[in-house]
A protein has these predicted regions:
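Short alpha-helical segments used as structural interaction elements across diverse proteins
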Residues: 7-8, 133, 265
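Hydrophobic alpha-helical segments, especially transmembrane helices
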Residues: 11-12, 102, 269
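Basic/polar, cationic surfaces and motifs that engage anionic cell-wall
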Residues: 25-43, 47-50, 176-294
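Active-site-adjacent loop/helix surface patches within enzyme catalytic domains
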Residues: 32-91, 96-195
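Bacterial N-terminal signal peptides
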Residues: 12-23
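Bacterial N-terminal signal peptides that target proteins for export
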Residues: 2-13
């Protein structure tokens, strides 16, 4: 074989080797956190298999007819595990909400780093990159740390009943078409798998109006609602009656109205989008009335 041919083969082999090394590094980049994830699942499994609580001590009450007072005393009881009679009627608790976020970071790599370092104490079930690639960080049945302090209707612990979906977006730019396409596909899967009601697809700002503004006004909520993910007002709007109370309507929809201005701004970020001031125009009231009637 000619010397030039040998050099060509060597260059090709070098490129192939470099590609394999790079691929291996990419695959193993999160090997440490993947291992920690599995270890944490084992810990949770042990917690589920732990003995039931000890029986509580019995109390006895003695009435003194002379003083007219009742004395309560504790009967000593040997600690023992409560009796267990295992029922066969159970399954895993399933998520009932999906909360959509934008990452407010400048790159997918930065977001994945944030979600995999120990000190951040924040996570989501899914992250969708600008190119539409979907990353699953948590099993759907695991309680993620994405909602934080928030409230929707009477629910005050959204983390326990929701899935968190993060979109790689800094909050100042439109969402990409591949990203939204992947999101719609993912939401369709989650909705069918867990029978999540259409109204239960909401944004982070909806549940935490005093402190969150994601997803931003660029987010296509109407497009999602047309596919069955979230609410949207009717095309033909009605003028609300004179006795219509917007604060009550916001509360009935689900918003936390303890800070009314913040609730109005969150509502407008979701449904109006081109104006997120705390004042309600006639148009805003008609939109709110349409949603309230649903």
């Amino acid at each position: 074989m000619a010397h030039g041919g040998i050099c060509t083969i060597r260059r090709a082999m070098s490129i192939l080797l470099a590609t394999l090394v790079l691929s291996a590094c990419t695959t193993n980049r999160y090997a440490k956190t993947n291992k920690q994830y599995k270890q944490q699942l084992k810990v949770l499994t042990k917690q589920m298999q732990a003995p039931l609580p000890y029986a509580t001590p019995r109390l006895t009450a003695t009435y003194d007819s002379i003083t007219g007072m009742t004395a309560v005393s504790e009967i000593p009881q040997t600690k023992r595990e409560a009796r267990q009679v295992a029922s066969i009627h159970f399954n895993l608790r399933k998520p009932n909400y999906v909360i959509i976020h934008h990452t407010a970071q400048d790159s997918l790599e930065q977001t994945l780093h944030t979600f995999t370092v120990p000190h951040s104490e924040v996570s989501a079930h899914y992250v969708i990159g600008r190119n539409g690639e979907v990353y699953q960080l948590l099993n759907d049945y695991v309680r993620g740390w994405h909602a934080g302090a928030g409230k929707w209707g009477t629910v005050t612990d959204l983390n326990s009943i929701s899935l968190g979906v993060e979109l790689d977006n800094n909050g100042k730019e439109p969402f990409t078409e591949p990203q939204i396409y992947s999101l719609l596909t993912l939401l369709d899967t989650l909705k069918q798998r867990y029978n999540i009601p259409s109204a239960n697809f909401i944004g982070h700002s909806d549940i935490a109006p005093s402190r969150k503004v994601d997803p931003s006004a660029f987010f296509p909520w109407k497009r999602l609602a047309e596919r069955g993910f979230g609410m949207w007002p009717d095309e033909v709007l009605m003028t609300p009656p004179e006795n219509f109370n917007p604060e009550d309507a916001l509360r009935i929809i689900g918003y936390d109205t303890r800070n009314l201005d913040a609730a109005i701004k969150a509502f407008k970020l979701h449904y109006i989008q081109d104006d997120i001031s705390p004042e309600l125009t006639d148009y805003d009231l008609s939109v709110l009335y349409s949603l309230y009637r649903k």
